[in-house]
C-alpha cells in the first residue's frame, strides 16, 4: 500500500525544486531521462566563471528528478534571451553584466545544454532531442525574481542548436558575439597546447554537425596547422551566424564584435537593453558599463581595464605575428571562395 506521507513529502520536494530558479538545472541524464539539479543561488553564480562541475561548489545540495515531473511542476517561463558566441570574445563578461536584480539574470554556459549536444552527437532520435531541449530551456528559463528575464550564454559547443532554440522560443532575442579573427587566433596561440587542442576538438564537433561548407576532406584538415584549424572553426561559426541573421531577421538577432563591446560598453549595453526588452533606466545601463563586469577580469576577478585587455592582445599577437598574418589571409581567401562574409550582418551598434 502506498505511504501517503512519502507521496506528500516527495511532491513537496518536487515542487520546491522545480519552482525555484536557485535550483540550477545542471545536467541531463538520457539513460534515466532525469535532470540533475544543484543548489546555486545568485551569489554562487556571481562567484562562478562557468556553471561546470569543476567550478560549482562541490558540497552544494543536489537532487535528481524525472525530467517530465520537473517540467510539469516548473513555474511560468521568464522572458528568455541568448548570447551565442565564437569563444574568446568577452562573452563571460557580458553574461555577468546581465546579473541585475529586478531586471535579469545571466547564466554562464549551463552544462545541461552541452549534455544535450553530446547526446545528439551520439545518435539520439532528433524528435527526442528537440523535446528535451525544449524542456531544458523551460527549466533554465525559470525567473530568479518577479519580472526578471533570463539571459543564457551557452557554450559555443551548443551553437549548432541555436536555430532550434530560437525556433522554439519565438519571443526570444539573441546576440551573436564574436572576436575579430586576428584577436581570436592570438587568444588560441596564447593558450599554448591547450588552446590548440581545444580548436581541434571544436573542429571534430562541427564536422559531426555538418557545419563546414568549405569542401575540405579529411586529408585537408590533417594537413592544416593548428591556427588554420582555429580559423576554419571561426569561419564555420561566422557562416552559422549569417544563417541565423538571414532566418530570424535583425528584429530578433544582432551581431557584435568584442572590440566594439569593449570600446563602447555603454552603447552596447543600451542597445542590448532595448533588444532584450529589459526596461533598465539610462543610469542603470551606465552603472553596468562602468561597473565590475567591464572593469574586472571575468575569469581572474582582478582589475582589468580595456587598456589592459588591449595590451594583453598585442602581446599575444606580437609573439605569433607572422603565423597569424598568414592564416588570416588564408582564411579570407577560404571565406571568399565559400561566399562567407568576414563581418556578419545586423550589427547591434550601427
Can you describe what each PLM-predicted range is?
Residues 125-135, 194-209, 301-310:
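A polyampholytic, Gly/Pro-enriched intrinsically disordered region
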Residues 5-6, 11-252, 257-282:
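PAPS-dependent sulfotransferase catalytic domain
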